[in-house]
Amino acid sequence: MRQEIHPKYTEVTVTCSCGNTFVTRSTAGKKEMNIDICSECHPFYTGKQRIVDTAGRVDKFKKRFGGMKKI
């Protein structure tokens, strides 16, 4: 391999909004990352059905299109 053409691959501490933290490796260049959902709180892995609403997108959609008549 050619030297010094590849990005640095460092350890990163990832923190989920549910409070779960874990360490992985990344080329992102940050020491810490924040994520909205992880395997501890994702509905597929937990078996619990819920709507993952980031920043009120579902409410915004219902507000915008909820009053429309069916065609």
Curated annotation (Swiss-Prot):
The keyword Iron does not apply. InterPro entries: Ribosomal_bL28/bL31-like_sf, Ribosomal_bL31, Ribosomal_bL31_A, Ribosomal_bL31_sf. Zn(2+) binds at C16, C18, C38, C41. Coiled coil: none annotated. Keywords: Metal-binding, Ribonucleoprotein, Ribosomal protein, RNA-binding, rRNA-binding, Zinc. It holds the Pfam family Ribosomal_L31. GO terms for biological process: translation. It comes from the Bacteria. Binds 1 zinc ion per subunit. GO terms for molecular function: metal ion binding; rRNA binding; structural constituent of ribosome. The keyword RNA-binding applies. GO terms for cellular component: ribonucleoprotein complex; ribosome. Its cofactor is Zn(2+). Binds the 23S rRNA. Belongs to the bacterial ribosomal protein bL31 family. Type A subfamily. Part of the 50S ribosomal subunit. PANTHER family: 50S RIBOSOMAL PROTEIN L31, CHLOROPLASTIC, LARGE RIBOSOMAL SUBUNIT PROTEIN BL31A. This is Large ribosomal subunit protein bL31. It comes from Francisella tularensis subsp. tularensis (strain SCHU S4 / Schu 4). The lineage of its organism: Bacteria, Pseudomonadati, Pseudomonadota, Gammaproteobacteria, Thiotrichales.
